[in-house]
Amino acid sequence: MNQPNRGQILQTVFSHFFPVASPDSELVPSSLHEDITPILRVAKDVEDTNPRSLFLQDLDIKSVDDSINILSGHSHALDKANELDPTSSGRDVRQFKNTILQWLEKNNESTLKARQKSSDAHEMQSFYQQYGDEGINDLLNAGAGSSSSQRTKIYQTAVVLYDVLDAVHRKANIKVAAKILESHAEVEAKNKIYVPYNILPLDPDSKNHAMMRDPKIVAVLKAIRYTSDLTWQIGHKINDDEDVLDWLKTMFRFQKDNVSNQREHLILLLANVQMRQTQRQPNLLDDRALDTVMEKLLGNYNKWCNHVGLESSLRFPKDKQQKVVQQRKLLYTGLYLLIWGEAANLRFMPECLCYIYHHMAFELFEMLESKGSKKKYKPKNPTYSGKDEDFLTKVVTPVYKTIAEEAKKSGEGKHSEWRNYDDLNEYFWSKQYLDKLGWPMKANADFFCKTSQQLGLNKSEKKPDLGDGCVGKVNFVEIRTFWHLFRSFDRMWSFYILSLQAMIIIAWNETSESGGAVFHKVLSVFITAAKLNLFQAFLDIALSWKARHSMSTHVRQRYIFKAVAAAVWVLLMPLTYAYSHTSIFIVAILIYLSPNMLPEMLLLIPSIRRTLEKSDFRPVKLIMWWSQPELYIGRGMHESAWSIYKYMMFWIVLLTSKLAFSYYVEQIKPLMGPTKEIMSVPMPGYWLPEFFPHVKNNRGVVITLWSPVILVYFMDTQIWYAIVSTLVGGLYGAFRHIGEIQTLGMLRSRFQSLPGAFNACLIPNENTKEKGIKLAFSRKCHKIPNTNGKEAKQFSQMWNTIINSFREEDLISNRELELLLMSCWAYPDLDFIRWPIFLLASKIPIAVDIAKKRNGKHRELKNILAEDNCMSCAVRECYASIKKLLNTLVTGNSDLMLITTVFTIIDTHIEKDTLLTELNLSVLPDLHGHFVKLTEYVLQNKDKDKIQIVNVLLKILEMVTKDILKEEIKRLHLLLTVKESAMDVPSNLEARRRLTFFSNSLFMEMPGAPKIQNMLSFSALTPYYSEDVLFSTFDLEKENDGVSILFYLQKIFPDEWKNFLERVKCGTEEELDAIDYLKEEIRLWASYRGQTLTKTVRGMMYYQKALELQAFFDLANERELMKGYKSAEASSSGSSLWAECQALADIKFTYVVACQQYSIHKRSGDQRAKDILTLMTTYPSLRVAYIDEVEQTHIYSKGTSENFYYSALVKAAPQTYSTDSSDSGHMLDQVIYQIKLPGPPIIGEGKPENQNNAIIFTRGEALQTIDMNQDYYIEEAFKMRNLLQEFLEKNGGVRYPTILGLREHIFTRSVSCLAWFMSNQEHSFVTIGQRVLANPLKVRFHYGHPDVFDRVFHLTRGGVSKASKVINLSEDIFAGFNSTLREGTVSHHEYIQVGKGRDVGLNQISMFEAKIANGSGEQTLSRDLYRLGHQFDFFRMLSCYFTTVGFYFCSMLTVLTVYVFLYGRLYLVLSGVEKELGNKPMMMEIILASQSFVQIVFLMAMPMIMEIGLERGFYDALFDFVLMQLQLASVFFTFQLGTKFHYYCKTLLHGGAEYRGTGRGFVVFHAKFAENYRFYSRSHFVKATELGILLLVYHIFGPTYIGLFTISIWFMVGTWLFAPFLFNPSGFEWHEIVEDWADWKKWIEYDNGGIGVPPEKSWESWWEKDIEHLQHSGKWGIVVEIFFALRFFIFQYGLVYQLSAFKNKYSSLWVFGASWLLILILLLTVTVLDYARRRLGTEFQLLFRIIKVSLFLAFMAIFITLMTCRLILPQDVFLCMLALIPTGWGLLLIAQSCKPLIQQPGIWSWVMTLAWVYDLVMGSLLFIPIAFMAWFPFISEFQTRMLFNQAFSRGLHISRILSGQRKHRSSKNKD
């Protein structure tokens, strides 16, 4: 047997890892990937050319161990293997090698037979020479004719081939030919030059590339390559193309790929800025452009230097040439970009980067100055400049490790016990700490402090002295408590409390006191204010206590001084009030208020206040010391005076309305009379024991009655906010022309104005568009001359691009496409715009009919044509088309002369305006009919019709096959035949919506469009983890209850499915299934209707298409424009106009998808990686960034390895051989950049970390963040350059916007009724809600995608999101917080929209709501919200509160009001007080009832009704609202109220916030009962059960009157119990119920848990996980949990005395004690049974049964005895159950909270048993009514029609009938 060769390794690897015929080069272990993958890729390319060469290339795998060495007999293979992984210790390496060995043994013989030469060496040499002759030489000869990507690929291939050739020759002891060595040397040199590039090909041969010919690019390149004044390190070989960034690399030891990445970044940034500058010297870099970039990049650094008191390191030489100064600026700018590009996780700490940059820039300055110094000394080297990658290892890595170590504590620790990104960053806000850290950074500095555990010390060992100690939390501590709400918004709470006190005083004394006396009493509110101020000062100290050592001295002094001052005023105020005159007390008040007067007065002069706040001048800081903490951020945030006036008036109106309503109508004044009466009633006799026997009045009763009213008082501002914001938002939207074009009829009526509006908005021109109030009241439509000129051509091409996009998306049919397209062919005879056929529909038939009926009445005909411009255009175009058609078809001289004569006569009459009077128009109908037939015959072109055409036309019949003439004949035929049916084109609702919105937006206010060269450049970034890229065929056809996703989509998108079949030319689904290659089209069609990455990428790549078309409009001359962009695109070449358009688009736009796990998916053969690669191949401009984890084995340390992490960017690799494009195996990616990281980058929240990893690969001045569940539209992409201009306009503000908010359209509304509810709710928020937030309130933040960021501003200030674990769970909104705190501003724009998907199933929606509620809970604890609450003025602070955490806190108060009301009423009922007082407490319920229903109606429905009314009409809005109620929207929203309440409270008390992936899929499957129980048990079922028991007891002992508020609570109870099953697909199908019961019994089975058992499989595992958050809760959280659990014992206390044996007889406390004795007996019984079951249940089964029977008989005997003796009655048994059930639950809650104290095996097992019994009983009781309703088929029918639209409901029933046939067909397809 011949010895195996290394070439066989290739096939072996992939036959094992990916079983296909040809090997996959991507499935290589990460430790071998870098060396082996290039060889395998080359082998794939040459596989078909030379099989033996393929075999031999596989030889050079280099990683074969001793077993392969025995076979090969050559030491070289072993040496190479030992060099890489001698012990096969890397992950999957041994498996990789064994598979190779098996393939070697199997395929050696066959490859030897295929060998053409005598030996492997000669075979390889022959192939290499052939490749050189045919590949490399042709490439060299082609020169600039080949692309840079092709050259790069060919040279890389040649290098790999030579490596294989050299290895084979050395094995055979043959020298490589000199000619080959010479060729290889040239190739090797070229290979170093031609590296993969991202956007700019910077190799020497790409000078003629369209981008590289741009003068701005050339100018920037020339500037950065000026290095003649720089001194390189000794030994460095200088190349001609090296630049200042290369010099920085050699001096500071940055990574090569980081330099390459930032080089392109800097070039594009400077070039794009220079494009907007007025050209001075076109071939030189303009200093203005460089200064602009430098100012934006280094603005934060300069501000930081001023704050910490450091002199800036940006120092420039004096009296130097401009080139030298410019070079210095480029060096400073490039240095910052290189630091930022390699900083990894440090990018979240902008001031840390400022610190690093400050010292490195100073070292740069010293190096440059030492070169120019006259003194002779050695130039100074940087501190960290020894080895390669020193910057990473010595600067970035130490800081990163500190971050990583702190992040590890976040898993189980509290926020206060670890430092997050903000804490570590704020360390660099103090010069004191900077001096301690020093430069070079001291390893023993307090910043790097380590715990004993990190140092590896035992508890007994003493920690060594590491310096100044550990710096913990800095400036702020996130303590988990509700008091953060008061601390952050203390001014608001003080205002409410003082207002309430004042109103109560006035109402109480309104009739009994004089005005002066009442005024004096009202002044007592300032005593309360002083107490509240003291409480606030106490909270500041208490909640910041853990940061006392790390906060600066002036902050500590400020806290102490404020506390002392507040304490003094608490003493002085009561004394002054009690012992002095009112006037003296007023003076004291003025003195008390004086420290806060200056900031409030300066509110009216915001420019002065901004200046004072931003100043770092010491005297100014002293003046502002009291009102503003000395922090780096949160200063100068005040808006303009006009903006302040607007939101001030908003809140004055709102608060006035709220307080007046509360006082006069609802809460204060109406309740004073009943309250006085209650207070005057003598103390009633209590049925319960009196704990306070000496109380002489009814204050306790008043507190009980007023408590829910007070809660409503604090909560109802949210309702008033909903009312006022709806009115303001609706008014604002109306003034902005929103919804002016609502229907197709409105679109047709204004369509002729569209070209003018398009020209004014989307075409660069000098005319300024009306803005502001002028535009709001303007009804003038933009019009252009009705000529077929340049403007019309531009509009028609843009319009046709949109319509063609609709057809590609299957929104319209082929016929609708023809009716909607505008004709782009120029007619010399036509001087007007040729409108789309749908606009001219039925105009010709109507005109013919009118002409026939009114023959001779030429004046009427002229008036009709004059009034109807569309009819006039249709008639003129029809005449011109017929004239051209006949002149084209007729060639005979006599016939042509006759036709010419006829048309000449007609033209003469037209010129003289005598056509209608001289010609007989009655024959027009006959002529019309003949022309219709003629066009039909010509279009069909059938032989049998030729006899119907005159002989003269037969001769030239073949001419109709020409495209232009054919299109014109089609148009003429449509003009002649189309009737009224075209008026409803397009019929698809989505197409209608998009067309009407786009048309409407052209009449809205937007900035003028700049030319493409002058627009801001931008990038789009999409974070992706592991969601669906493209639906697989299996996923689409997989059925659940007879319903597949594909079937589901066909039913809810029937018209789009029909259009799809028409597009792929299939009449039926069966024809479609028969064609294999159309399966990919089906996958795409379905994926475009889901929430997939493919849909998002397609939408975002419309930017590329739109920019190319707009660039064509800018660059094309008149002749090229008339030909159209498609003509330019078809003739594209390296020097063509279209190449320039593409180059401009590439310069202006970049799209990066951050596929975090792309490398993992690729190496595991995951289909998602292949689908992503397909996307890159389909869209060559798409880039994918990912985190590459590479395993590296240690050569000298056996069995050990280390993982290294890289930020990588890839694109689709070019193809050098023509292969079948459908073969996915030939699609490869190409690594562009690979930047090493200091460690695993995902140490915080995953999504922001993923964004941070990819942001370094984005380009431009703006960055749009797009989630992977979003979509975009071609028509909206045309408006992007207008939107970007918003960054250059202040729009009445004082600063340029830093975030542009966009409107969103929820495209999942048609999926189900739940999706519709969520769509309407979300739609109102992203439109009218954010409209008001941005203007007038000025508190719009970042609520997720698709906002556009000022990229340069944010990359220097922490990025586009925050990533600290847990606290930044809602990472998006923190970007808005951060931007606002750093003097940015956020605007909102509604003339552009982006599609967005939402969750469509109840469980998905609930998980999303839970995540948002968790995030809001964490926001409540955050420093960002605290600083906004304190640094905003009072009115803006109110806006911030009620639009962020206030909404969730008010939702919590809504539910708490129910609890307080019920427990209070229960107290009144059970104690007998209510009976004594009569009906006086009823007033409280009436008030609460009105409040409850006002909340439901206004809070939920009013914004939705207003926005739908604006956009579609108020009739549709009202209809939608009624329909939503019929589909149980109130049930849905009430249920979600419980979700918000539970998770917000849980987060604030105990934590447990986490990201919850919802899947974003279609929910057509049934959720199991056990799954619903797990998810909703604690959040809804338990609370609903408690409320139900309270209501039941209240109705038993209370009055017969049932109020509206009580009814609403019953509604809430029913909703919380049964909504999950009501909205569960097939929730009432009997067969599903049976399966659910079996699954429930299996899950609830006791003792089926344990370590490693998931919660989905075991009740025990689920229960342990459910209470896990209590183990990490703080002490106060546990105390609060126990305190609230005591309410169940109070409930028991009340019910015990209602037993017939004790009622009205015994009121002693021993009765209550006896009830506890009974509880203990029951618990002991349960414990005995549990113990017996565990001990005796297996081996002593009989004894266990005897014990159970004995206990049962004993209890029955006791029960019968008590009943016989009349000691208890039957109703007493029921009351005992009602009392004991809550008591047991309360004991269980307390036990769970105290788990660490009682976690002894015996005790804890009792607790677990009790919990299991409760879940078993509660779940079983829930299941009974569901099973009962499943008996009735009509309930299931109703549910299906309610959940899904009618078309799907009908299809669902049909599918069940035909399910057997479809399954049979599916199985046949698989076969």
Swiss-Prot record:
Q: Which residues cross the membrane?
A: 492-512, 522-542, 559-579, 584-604, 641-661, 702-724, 1442-1462, 1486-1506, 1517-1537, 1581-1601, 1602-1622, 1676-1696, 1709-1729, 1742-1762, 1773-1793, 1816-1836
Gene Ontology molecular functions: 1,3-beta-D-glucan synthase activity
- According to its UniProt record, the EC number is 2.4.1.34
The molecule here is called Callose synthase 4
Pfam families noted in UniProt: FKS1_dom1, Glucan_synthase
Q: What organism does the UniProt record list as the source?
A: Arabidopsis thaliana (Mouse-ear cress)
Q: What enzyme class is recorded for this protein?
A: transferase
Source superkingdom: Eukaryota
Membrane topology according to the record: Multi-pass membrane protein
What is one Gene Ontology biological process annotated in the Swiss-Prot or TrEMBL record?
cell wall organization
Chief place of localization: membrane
Q: Which residues lie on this side of the membrane: Cytoplasmic?
A: 1-491, 543-558, 605-640, 725-1441, 1507-1516, 1697-1708, 1763-1772, 1837-1871
What InterPro entries does this protein map onto? FKS1-like_dom1, Glyco_trans_48_dom, Vta1/CALS_N_sf
Q: Which family does it belong to?
A: Belongs to the glycosyltransferase 48 family.
Q: Is this entry keyworded Membrane?
A: yes
Keyword annotations from UniProtKB, A to Z: Cell membrane, Cell shape, Cell wall biogenesis/degradation, Glycosyltransferase, Membrane, Transferase, Transmembrane, Transmembrane helix
Which residues are exposed on the Extracellular face of the membrane? 513-521, 580-583, 662-701, 1463-1485, 1538-1580, 1623-1675, 1730-1741, 1794-1815
User: What biological function has been recorded for the protein in this entry?
Assistant: Involved in callose synthesis at the forming cell plate during cytokinesis. During plant growth and development, callose is found as a transitory component of the cell plate in dividing cells, is a major component of pollen mother cell walls and pollen tubes, and is found as a structural component of plasmodesmatal canals.
Q: Which compartment or compartments is the protein found in? A: Cell membrane
Cellular component, GO annotation? 1,3-beta-D-glucan synthase complex; plasma membrane
- Gene3D superfamilies found in the cross-reference section: Vacuolar protein sorting-associated protein vta1 (1.25.40.270)
Catalysed transformations (reactions) = [(1->3)-beta-D-glucosyl](n) + UDP-alpha-D-glucose = [(1->3)-beta-D-glucosyl](n+1) + UDP + H(+)
SMART domains linked to this entry: FKS1_dom1
**Record's signal peptide:** none
